[in-house]
């Protein structure tokens, strides 16, 4: 669950695989700024095919009498966020920290090479899978470098999540 959306575990019945479905909060689904940000997250993340970035499979909106709610279907990651691991275990070894950061940097380098800047990298947006793989997630406020219209970010606006 994030600021503008909720994430649910689901099954893609057609392909028989576990997925995560990120749904915009219903109260925000009528706000054009949030709709654009959500759409941009889906488009940006879908452009990125990297082992350390959560994959996006599909996007759409629910047919709803009370108004459509946008969603993103993505890879379901079994594991914990880096934030949760640090809170539960405290300090980690230099070797583990370096391995995690190396994979995060690889993912960010890949996204930057694709022209997409994450802009909210933090321990809560890094998952460590049950097998030890690293997955960067939540490109919700990412910006494509080619997007010269920074209409989504106003001058002097704060970007990211307050920690």
Identify the role of each PLM range.
Residues 6:
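Conserved N-lobe ATP-binding subsite of Hanks-type protein kinase domains
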Residues 11-18:
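Conserved N-lobe loop of protein kinases adjacent to the ATP-binding glycine-rich P-loop
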Residues 25-47:
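AlphaC helix of the eukaryotic protein kinase fold
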Residues 30-33, 68, 129-163:
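Activation segment of protein kinases
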Residues 59-62:
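Activation-segment/catalytic-loop signature of the eukaryotic protein kinase fold
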Residues 66-81, 85:
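Conserved short submotifs of the Hanks-type protein kinase catalytic core
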Residues 100-101:
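Activation segment signature within eukaryotic-like protein kinase domains
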Residues 104-116:
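Protein kinase catalytic-loop region centered on the HRD/HxD motif
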